[in-house]
Every structure is written in structure tokens, then in C-alpha cells.
Amino acid sequence: MRREFYYQDDTSNKFWTIELQGNECVTTHGKIGAKARETRKEFPTAEAAQGELEKQVAGKLKKGYIEGALSAVPAQVKPDWTTMTMSDEVFWSIVRLFNWKKSGDDDAVIKPAVAALAQMSEADIARFEDTLAEKLHALDTEAHAREIGEEAYQPGKHFSVDWFLYERCAVVANGRDYYAAVLADPKQMPKDLEFEGMLSVAPSAHERKTGHDFDHVTPVSYETYSNTAGWPNGNSG
């Protein structure tokens, strides 16, 4: 029996199916309405194939896929950003719009997010920046700075405050779940990875909406060392 699953969010509208054909595990996937791509994997026994099926199904459910007939999948509802008020949930929805297929070109990566945020009010754009600052501020700790790879913080040695900021930006840019994991466990900080473009989302959206520069000052600073509680020994970098 073929099992069918689908996943929808602000940017995704895709399906995945899986079934056993003898000792083979057969999966298909793709965008809803588009031609499916098929993958086949053969196993020594039917029991081994069944184990693989159960493993893959569990993985898809964990990622948020819903099991249901593809013929009955509801139409994808595109978000109306003009009616939304900035919140933590909306903040992460904006971040999910980043187009990582354009990696290497920060402006292109953030372009869909900038376009969405620019549809919201000026106050909401400012609140997006406030939320970003709060999240970057929370990551501004010595424990996190010690886990960023080659440029890691070491007392008494040169330490790039800008690089650490851009590494923290990469954490936020990779979404809510990753951010929460890194915030709880500094050892999960990315190594030698930055995303300075995160800092341009609100300013670019504001300029697109108003034609003016963004001069908003956030209640908390995201600059390195601003979170004094995260640097109980001060800094000597």
C-alpha cells in the first residue's frame, strides 16, 4: 500500500510518497501538481525494507509532513503580509523566505524576505529589527564565542567582534529550531560560517517601502560584548 504525505508552509507545497514492492522501498517526491521524481532502493529482505519505510515515515512526520491522500490536499494559502502584525511567529516566517539556492549572493538570498517585510507597516519593520537584535543579543556570550571555529574567542588574543556578530546572524538565518538548539548548547555554533546579510533585511525593507534610510535604534544592542551577562569575566580580546 502506498502511503502519501504532503507539506505546506509559506514557501513550500510539496508531496512525498512511499511504498514497498517486494524487497524494494519506492519513494516519490516533488512539488504538488508537478511531475514526481522516483527513487528505488533494494534491501536483502522484505523485513529490512519495511524497517526502512518506517524510518523514513518517522523522519517525514518529524519534519512536519502530514499523511493524507494527495487528491484531497487543500490549496496552498499564500500569506497576506499586509494584514499581519509582527510577532515572533511572523519573524520566523519572514526568515523562512530566504532563498538559499542563491547562496553566495546575500542580497539575492534575502530578496523574498525583504519583499514580504516591505508589505508590512513601518512599525512592524522596526519590530522585526528589534526581534533580530534580541536574538543576536542572547547569543552574545563568551561560551558561544569560543565555539565558532578558527576565529574563536581566546582571552588575550585577537578576536573579531564583527565576525562573531556575522556568525550569530548565520544562526538566526538558519531558522527557529536551529537557533533554539544553538542558544541552548553553544557547542552547536556553526564553524567558520557567517551571514552578514541578515542585518540588511529590515533596512532594505524600510527603504523599499519609504524610499528613506532606516535610522531605527533597537532597545538592546546586538554588537559583540553588549550582553554583559554573557561575558561575566569581561573581555580581553
Language-model features: locations:
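Short aromatic-glycine-(Arg/Gly/Cys) micro-motifs in beta-strand/loop hairpins
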Residues: 10, 14-39
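Short, hydrophobic/aromatic-rich segments at coil-to-beta transitions
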Residues: 1-6
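Basic, alpha-helical nucleic-acid-binding regions used in initiation and control of genome expression
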Residues: 177-181, 185-237
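Core of folded catalytic or high-affinity ligand/protein-binding domains
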Residues: 115-192
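A short, charged, amphipathic alpha-helix used as a generic interaction element across diverse proteins
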Residues: 44-62
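Intrinsically disordered, low-complexity charged/polar segments
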Residues: 62-82
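A short, surface-exposed interaction/processing loop segment used at functional sites
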Residues: 31-42, 185-194
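N-terminal domain-onset segments
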Residues: 78-144
